[in-house]
């Protein structure tokens, strides 16, 4: 039985590194206009995904803080 390799899950840090690489390619001056637009579009899409990820994580942190505050109130009731 062969094992399938798991695809690496999306990672914020890797996405930011990808955007930095795309920006470096754009700034190099070695691409033609069509390639510049393509790289710019890739960077914009990746940054949009990063923003969505950060918003999701912000909401998760807010929920955790609310739970901790509730737990603290419960302990103070004793």
From Swiss-Prot:
Keywords: Cytoplasm, Exonuclease, Hydrolase, Nuclease. Its main location: cytoplasm. Its EC number is 3.1.11.6. It is an enzyme of class 3 (hydrolase). Pfam families: Exonuc_VII_S. GO terms for molecular function: exodeoxyribonuclease VII activity. Gene3D superfamilies: Exonuclease VII, small subunit. It is found in: Cytoplasm. GO terms for biological process: DNA catabolic process. One of its GO terms (cellular component) is exodeoxyribonuclease VII complex. It catalyses: Exonucleolytic cleavage in either 5'- to 3'- or 3'- to 5'-direction to yield nucleoside 5'-phosphates. NCBIfam families: xseB. Bidirectionally degrades single-stranded DNA into large acid-insoluble oligonucleotides, which are then degraded further into small acid-soluble oligonucleotides. Belongs to the XseB family. Heterooligomer composed of large and small subunits. This is Exodeoxyribonuclease 7 small subunit. The lineage of its organism: Bacteria, Bacillati, Cyanobacteriota, Cyanophyceae, Synechococcales. The gene is xseB.
